[in-house]
Amino acid sequence: HTLLRRQRQMCIRDSLYPYMAPEGSYLLAKGRLFQLNQRDLEEVVQVQTDPLLFGRTPVLAVGSNRAPYQLLRKFGSEAIVPVTSARLHDCDVVHTALVSYYGAIPCTAFPSSGTITELKIVWLDEDQLLHMHKTEGIGVAYDYVEMQGVAHQLEVPVGPVFGYAARAGVLAWEDSQPAGLAAISAQARQFKTVRQGEVAQRVCKLTNLTEVWSVEQFITTMQTEKILREELIGQLQTHAIQPDQPPWRVIPVSMDGIDEYL
């Protein structure tokens, strides 16, 4: 019964993609959350041998990777992950033409002139970055990219910011335009926004599923039936839009061990 409750709780959380994230910057440290502002960052720097962000790679998190729940799921309860606030200019965050291994319809950045999205940057050490590559299905589901148009909200080390871009493209709606995530704050949006339940229903209608499932039923089935999930992803390609001249540069990465994340 406990396992069933846990599975249901996870399903409910997955239906709430991209999950709750604290306002502002924060530090996830061994399962606990701490607010992180400029003064805190400077104080942390003074009491450590190395600065908090030293040796870490800044990775823009446009969806679930900005949330403590997902970071805990990916890195475990002993992980230390600094997360800083950022704005992404001239892009919106929209739903992909993809179904993730955890059952949600994930998101990706997409060019949108004048739009400013409120996002996070996760600062990953070398091992965390390699594991993040795996969980993103690097080279198959997502490309690793160097982003443009990122504005930090704290003073952080100068250098490029990286991220992930969906290789399958983004899901087209009735107007042949993408649909943004209602849960992600943005200014001057050009695209309509929808919630995860609406996206799951659209995927059901666009593919060969015989009925429109509830979002919980959709997620549970996608988590457990990989062959069906792969079939749906293939069918969604006829409804996918690829970005034209995106503001990022692909960095070729290939690695083994990604099958369980596809």
At which residue positions do the language-model features occur?
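Single conserved hydrophobic/aromatic residue that forms the stacking wall/gate
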Residues: 1-12
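Short, contiguous, well-structured surface segments enriched in hydrophobic/aromatic residues
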Residues: 13-35, 88-105
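A short acidic-Thr-Gly-centered motif at the start of a beta-strand
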Residues: 45-55
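Short His-Asn-centered micro-motif
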Residues: 61-64, 124
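Short Gly/aromatic-enriched secondary-structure transition segments
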Residues: 72-83
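A structural-propensity feature for long, helix-poor, extended segments
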Residues: 95-122
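Acidic, glycine-rich loop-and-strand cores that form catalytic or ligand-binding grooves
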Residues: 121-146
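Mixed-charge (acidic/basic) macromolecular-recognition segments
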Residues: 158-254
